């Protein structure tokens, strides 16, 4: 099986889009762009379209499509397959492989399998609202074939006129702040990815209201890497990485292509 547009749209709705290449951590070897695509094919100052970003996402997701397909021992619907791929892309194929969710599913107990989605709402032992929402939507898609706010058509990220501002040619952060009657400092707090107020770019989406955006940094493990090496490169500890990635039960049992959280 392959993932449908509805499945891709579900993943897109939670991953977030960045059309300009960036380094979330200065020590990273490569840049990231689009819906979290990272690698040697991403170059400094590179800008891509939303269509290209989706193409890169589909390429990245294919590994999880193939992985889920191999793990299944029962027939599933397209919507159920989409939900499982979204789940695996978020928590890792290793986590899905060892999960009770997969055990119930392969035993033919679809209802119990669906209920297992909701248990995967923590990171580092703490419940996160974003994970709660993602698991709820995956479960709903799995059971009913419909996921709230996710279309089956090719879609572009939704923007809110009251909460975001798309940078236009000639815009400065101070002018945007003045226009919406706030301060540059507040905008910087709401947009932690903006490190330099003088370096914003046309097309960039800036959060102008609500709570500060919590930065979630993901990293895709490459062949030959160890958790110790990744921790050292990103100036953290193995213990902290394991807290952020509760699906990693053994620090020595990670694999190339696995996506983990760094913060």
Swiss-Prot record:
Its Gene Ontology molecular function terms? lysozyme activity
List the GO terms this entry assigns under cellular component, sorted alphabetically.
host cell cytoplasm
Q: Where in the cell is it found?
A: Host cytoplasm
Q: InterPro entries in the record, alphabetically?
A: Bacteriophage_GH24, Endolysin_autolysin, Endolysin_T4_type, Glyco_hydro_24, LysM_dom, LysM_dom_sf, Lysozyme-like_dom_sf, Lysozyme_dom_sf
| Swiss-Prot/TrEMBL keywords | Antimicrobial, Bacteriolytic enzyme, Cytolysis, Glycosidase, Host cell lysis by virus, Host cytoplasm, Hydrolase, Viral release from host cell
> Which catalytic residues are annotated?
15 (proton donor/acceptor)
Enzyme class (EC, first level): hydrolase
> Which is one Pfam family of this protein?
Phage_lysozyme
Its UniProt entry gives the catalysed reaction(s) as: Hydrolysis of (1->4)-beta-linkages between N-acetylmuramic acid and N-acetyl-D-glucosamine residues in a peptidoglycan and between N-acetyl-D-glucosamine residues in chitodextrins
EC number of the protein: 3.2.1.17
> Matching Gene3D superfamilies, A to Z?
1.10.530.40, LysM domain (3.10.350.10)
Superkingdom of the source? Viruses
Of which family is this protein a member?
Belongs to the glycosyl hydrolase 24 family.
Q: What is known of its domains?
A: LysM domains are thought to be involved in peptidoglycan binding.
The job of this chain, per UniProt, is described as: Endolysin with lysozyme activity that degrades host peptidoglycans and participates with the holin and spanin proteins in the sequential events which lead to the programmed host cell lysis releasing the mature viral particles. Once the holin has permeabilized the host cell membrane, the endolysin can reach the periplasm and break down the peptidoglycan layer.
Specify the protein name: Endolysin
Q: Gene name? A: 15
């Amino acid at each position: 099986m392959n993932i449908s547009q509805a499945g891709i749209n579900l993943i897109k709705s939670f991953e977030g889009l960045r059309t300009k290449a960036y380094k979330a951590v200065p020590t990273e070897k490569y840049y990231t762009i689009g819906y979290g695509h990272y690698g040697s094919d991403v170059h400094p100052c590179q800008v891509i379209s939303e269509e290209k970003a989706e193409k890169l996402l589909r390429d990245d997701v294919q590994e999880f499509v193939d992985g889920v397909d191999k793990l299944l021992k029962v027939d599933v619907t397209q919507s159920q397959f989409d939900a499982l791929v979204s789940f695996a892309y978020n928590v890792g194929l290793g986590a899905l492989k060892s999960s009770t969710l997969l055990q119930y599913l392969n035993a033919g107990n679809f209802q119990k399998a669906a209920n297992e989605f909701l248990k995967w709402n923590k990171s580092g032992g703490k419940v996160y609202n974003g994970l709660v929402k993602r698991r709820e939507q995956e479960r709903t898609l799995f059971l009913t074939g419909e996921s709230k706010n996710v279309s089956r058509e090719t879609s572009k990220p939704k923007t809110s006129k009251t909460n975001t501002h798309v940078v236009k040619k000639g815009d400065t952060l101070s002018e945007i702040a003045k226009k919406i009657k706030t301060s540059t400092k507040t905008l910087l707090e709401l947009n932690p990815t903006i490190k330099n107020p003088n370096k914003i770019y046309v097309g960039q989406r800036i959060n102008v209201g609500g709570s500060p955006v919590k930065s979630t940094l993901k990293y895709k493990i490459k062949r030959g890497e160890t958790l110790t090496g990744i921790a050292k490169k990103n100036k953290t500890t193995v213990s902290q990485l394991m807290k952020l990635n509760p699906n990693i039960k053994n620090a020595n049992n990670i694999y190339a292509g696995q996506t983990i959280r760094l913060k």
